[in-house]
């Protein structure tokens, strides 16, 4: 018997930007498909017209491509199983809804939202879990037709509900969780498969699509576990074999231990936000893969090729995955250190221009200056937008000194060191990092001061900061005019302090 060709799908709703959780779902499906030389399908689930955001699907596809996730079939690529937007498949859904109605497995329901809410309130008051109860209980076929005709005459629009068999167990062997089962009386009663506006519900449309698109494995988030028994009801009613299901654990905030929620403002949760900050796509791909999947060995840095080769759903965790911002920054920094410098230059330049620190129209000389700036900070940056803050001493005319910095330059040897350094620095033939270091060594010889007492006053006076890149590199990048202004300002502050 030939081995079944694996077909998976990522099926987002175009309700906004690409969320970390959705990106993980797409990524795991992508890795599973590529590892098994299978097919990745992109399907847009846009049946909820009220929640759809204009440009939402385009934004999601762009960010998937940015991450390095591609697909074989989809709305932009076509394929043998299209259309790949649910809004374009309405006739297909209607065909199977009518089939279920004709077979007596589904029916029109005219209960209003007010009646349904009153029913739920009554059930809650009785201590019963809210559920739909069959509105035609005990009625003959003719009586049901009369009741439906009367509802139609009132102008009521029906939904279509599917019958849930009584005393049934709906179970599946989950690829992540193992054996999962639900009793039919816990599903909530006969559920809606077609809304009043004629659009199918999620739990119906997804079954039709997965079956007709020959999806073999459904890897999705833990929040879909409760949907699965409803989908199994539909599969059974249509006489179809369901795919294999795997439900990935929740992603939690590592600091609060709570589920990562879109309302949690302590964590950036959309791929586009990380893109704008200058995170690298390979680093994000690497980090997201580790949210609920454990590689063999101790290493945490992997290329996409390595992840495709080693991906095994058996190593998906049953415990919640902790979203650790510091770990993401560390991983991205590993990639930044090794990244092509031209790529970093493009990203950092964009960040500096967005912050208004560098003009949009940039000269070749200024471009070279920015290149040097990026090169000296590349090792430090967790993401390129950090350069806006950590390199601010290069853009401010006269940065204020902190209390700690003022205390440093008030020390006994500070003024003589600063004055001697200014003299030595202005005597060098070229204003370079090497010449700046030569001036520092000459200052040491002339003053007899060394170590921190030598370097700290010079750094503060020349750059107006206790921290920064190598002092020689910083002085070269700042240039002679700015460094002299900084030193003169520092000496004036000392004079104002009577030192």
Curated annotation (Swiss-Prot):
Tell me a GO cellular component.
cytosol
What does the record give as the reaction this protein catalyses?
tRNA(Glu) + L-glutamate + ATP = L-glutamyl-tRNA(Glu) + AMP + diphosphate
Q: What does this protein do?
A: Catalyzes the attachment of glutamate to tRNA(Glu) in a two-step reaction: glutamate is first activated by ATP to form Glu-AMP and then transferred to the acceptor end of tRNA(Glu).
Could you tell me one molecular function GO term of this UniProt entry? ATP binding
Indicate which residues form the motif 'KMSKS' region: 259-263
Q: What is its EC number?
A: 6.1.1.17
Task: Give the gene that encodes this protein.
Answer: gltX
User: What InterPro entries does the entry give?
Assistant: aa-tRNA-synth_I_cd-bd, aa-tRNA-synth_I_codon-bd_sub2, aa-tRNA-synth_I_CS, aa_tRNA-synth_I_cd-bd_sf, Glu-tRNA-ligase_bac/mito, Glu/Gln-tRNA-synth, Glu/Gln-tRNA-synth_Ib_cat-dom, GluQ/Sye
Motif location ('HIGH' region)? 12-22
- Binding positions (ATP): 262
- Superkingdom assignment: Bacteria
Q: Which family does it belong to?
A: Belongs to the class-I aminoacyl-tRNA synthetase family. Glutamate--tRNA ligase type 1 subfamily.
Q: Name one GO biological process term.
A: glutamyl-tRNA aminoacylation
Report the locations given in the UniProt record: Cytoplasm
EC top class named in words: ligase
- SUPFAM superfamilies according to UniProt: An anticodon-binding domain of class I aminoacyl-tRNA synthetases, Nucleotidylyl transferase
What is this protein identified as? Glutamate--tRNA ligase
Assembly notes: Monomer.
> Which Pfam families does the protein's record reference?
Anticodon_2, tRNA-synt_1c
UniProt keywords (A-Z) are: Aminoacyl-tRNA synthetase, ATP-binding, Cytoplasm, Ligase, Nucleotide-binding, Protein biosynthesis
């Amino acid at each position: 018997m030939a081995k079944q060709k694996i077909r998976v799908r990522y099926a987002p709703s175009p309700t906004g930007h690409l969320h970390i959780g959705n990106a993980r779902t797409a990524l795991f499906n992508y890795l599973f498909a590529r590892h098994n030389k299978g097919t990745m399908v992109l399907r847009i689930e846009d049946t909820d017209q009220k929640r759809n955001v204009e440009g939402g699907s385009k934004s999601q596809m762009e960010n998937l491509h940015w991450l390095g996730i591609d697909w074989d079939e989809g709305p932009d690529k076509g394929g043998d199983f299209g259309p790949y937007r649910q809004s374009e498949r309405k006739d297909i859904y209607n065909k199977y809804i009518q089939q279920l109605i004709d077979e007596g497995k589904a029916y029109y329901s005219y209960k209003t939202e007010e009646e349904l809410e009153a029913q739920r309130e009554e059930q809650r008051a009785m201590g019963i879990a809210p559920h739909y109860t069959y509105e035609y209980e005990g009625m003959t076929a003719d009586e049901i037709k009369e009741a439906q005709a009367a509802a139609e005459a009132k102008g009521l629009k029906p939904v279509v509900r599917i019958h849930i068999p009584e005393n049934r167990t709906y179970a599946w062997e989950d690829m992540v969780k193992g054996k999962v089962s639900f009793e039919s009386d816990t599903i909530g009663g006969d559920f809606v498969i077609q809304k009043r506006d004629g659009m199918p519900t999620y739990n119906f449309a997804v079954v039709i699509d997965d079956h007709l698109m020959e999806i073999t494995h459904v890897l999705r988030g833990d929040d879909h576990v409760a949907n699965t028994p409803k989908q199994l009801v539909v599969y059974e009613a249509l006489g179809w074999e369901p795919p294999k299901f795997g439900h990935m654990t929740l992603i939690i905030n590592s600091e609060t231990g709570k589920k990562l929620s879109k309302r949690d403002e302590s964590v950036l949760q959309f791929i586009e936000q990380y893109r704008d900050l200058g995170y690298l796509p390979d680093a994000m791909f690497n980090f997201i893969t580790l949210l609920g999947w454990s590689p063999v060995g101790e290493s945490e840095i992997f290329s996409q090729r390595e992840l495709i080769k080693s991906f095994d759903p058996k190593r998906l965790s049953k415990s919640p995955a902790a979203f650790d911002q510091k770990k993401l920054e560390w991983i991205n920094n590993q990639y930044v250190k090794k990244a092509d410098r031209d790529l970093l230059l493009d990203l950092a330049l964009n960040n500096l221009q967005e912050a208004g620190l560098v003009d949009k129209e940039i000269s070749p000389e200024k471009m070279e200056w920015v290149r040097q700036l990026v090169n000296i900070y590349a090792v430090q940056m967790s993401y390129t937008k950090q350069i806006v803050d950590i390199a601010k001493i290069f853009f401010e005319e006269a940065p204020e000194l902190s209390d700690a910095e003022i205390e440093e330059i008030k020390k006994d040897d500070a003024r003589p060191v600063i004055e001697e350094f200014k003299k030595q620095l202005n005597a060098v033939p070229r204003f370079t990092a090497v010449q700046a270091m030569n001036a520092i060594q000459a200052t040491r010889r002339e003053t007899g001061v060394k170590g921190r007492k030598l370097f700290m006053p010079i750094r503060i006076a020349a750059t107006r900061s206790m921290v920064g890149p190598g002092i020689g590199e910083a002085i070269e990048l700042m240039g002679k005019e700015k460094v002299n202004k900084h030193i003169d300002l520092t000496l004036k502050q000392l004079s104002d302090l009577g030192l």
